[in-house]
Amino acid sequence: MAEIRNYTINFGPQHPSAHGVLRLVLELDGEVVERADPHIGLLHRGTEKLAETRTWVQSVPYMDRLDYVSMMCNEHAYCMAIERLLGVEVPLRAQYIRVMFDEITRILNHLLNIGTHALDIGAMTMVLYTFREREDLMDAYEAVSGARMHAAYYRPGGVYRDLPDRMPQYQPNKFKNANVVKDLNAARQGSLLDFLDDFTQRFPRYCDEYETLLTDNRIWKQRTVGIGVVTPEQALAWGFSGPMIRGSGIAWDLRKKQPYEVYDKVDFDIPVGKNGDCYDRYLCRMEEMRQSNRIIRQCIDWLRKNPGPVITDNHKVAPPSREQMKSNMEELIHHFKLFTEGMHVPKGEAYAAVEHPKGEFGVYAVSDGANKPYRLKLRAPGFAHLAAMDEISRGHMIADVVAIIGTMDVVFGEIDR
């Protein structure tokens, strides 16, 4: 009788559930996974090397394109690393704006993750709900930076500009008549803070809608409970962070453990799972969105009461205002030097990490005193998570591999860098 052999198949990189360009080589015994071998590098763009040929500020837009669903969080880590090298103090208003946009980014990321994770498993409706709210938050991105995704809004020393006092309006067209446009513009009559205030009042109700669709849905639970279990010991050994480690019961969150910006001044809780499976990680992300909503509300209240500068007044780092340049030759020279040569960062090295929606996103920057980085190392959270794919998916059915990829929330921009 012929011997029974395992067979090997390719999962991706063209598979719709591969979340980009993931290629998994799966060794299967029937439908049970014996081995999963992730192949990475299909989206490698050499970001770390490219940064060595650009000035410090010119590399900010590269950061947006790493994890391209959590844009401003990437910029934040990079700007913090530069600020540590420079020893620059960020104005308090800029810190609150950064924290507010970090949390907007967290909600954007989790909405995309929960929507597409459900879509992968077969719950088609969820993604339609989550993209409805993403649209509002993308408008907040667009209001401050002009771009819906790659904002390049943070700068070493603060943010590019203060929050706008009016929101862009929808105009009637052949797809939307005047009545529809009037409803869409109802929340856009005031400033960006008014728009976000309106959103944060509505958002908890939307979260309840998502929970109605998924949390007690028995098919969703059958597909996620007990799937992709990670013990606390394994999570620590594999270097997990974010919802992947919190889902396993370890309350590790850089916003609480190593507070940066004004996270020690805002009130929020860290959701923690019990069983370390896909379902617990989903619940963690759901609760994180509610906590982010709380933080945004606190930031809105503070920003309304406290006007002030949004970028450092050190003109070796940040450009002077137009008014100053018109009357002062010194400021004009600063401006010219900044935008031709760039700032010179003192010799040294610094590591800055933020609590990114996916985990700990770190930037290790080495300066040799020049106007560009000597070396830039990016610590992507998804890299450690994907590395454990083989261990986590072993013994599961091939359909469960899709659920595990969804719960890891992998984005190849940051993994391949």
UniProtKB/Swiss-Prot annotation:
Gene3D superfamilies per record: Cytochrome-c3 Hydrogenase, chain B
Broad EC category: translocase
Location relative to the cell: Cell inner membrane
Segments forming a coiled coil: none
PROSITE patterns according to UniProt: COMPLEX1_49K (PS00535)
GO cellular component: plasma membrane
Protein name: NADH-quinone oxidoreductase subunit D
